[in-house]
Amino acid sequence: MAFLDQVEQAGVDIATDKWNLLCLGIFEDKELSNQQQQFDKVFSGRISEILAEDDFRGESGQTEFVHPGQGIPVKRLLLVGLGKREKFTIDKARHAGGTAAREAQKRRLAEFAVELFGKTALNESTGEIGQAVAEGLVLGSYQFTEYKTDRKSVV
């Protein structure tokens, strides 16, 4: 059995914190939250460029990896589609956490940061949203490896 075994709450200072991966949730309307707009400025408009293209539509479960470029301490950015803003629920925040965990696991990234997915669309407390996202991270990273003969190390 293998899974993500540690989730910590931490503020992210994009200008100084070094992360292998930062995960942001994007709705189908592609409207960035205030925090995401700040991230976009640090990334020199790279998030807006990706959203202007039609490849990433923000559909639930859709993902897009972005390499932000030189001079930015975050190595990779993962956009996670959240679906329609008006239909977003706390369970979909949990699902987005699972999607982020699986994508990080595929790339063997042990440490990564996620935002509170869909915080602007939910009436829940920050604690409830954080719990749902953390549950999604843990459940999404779960792998049953008991009977596998070729066990890969799991992030």
Show where each model-derived region lies.
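Glycine-/small-residue-enriched capping loops at alpha/beta junctions
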Residues: M1-V155
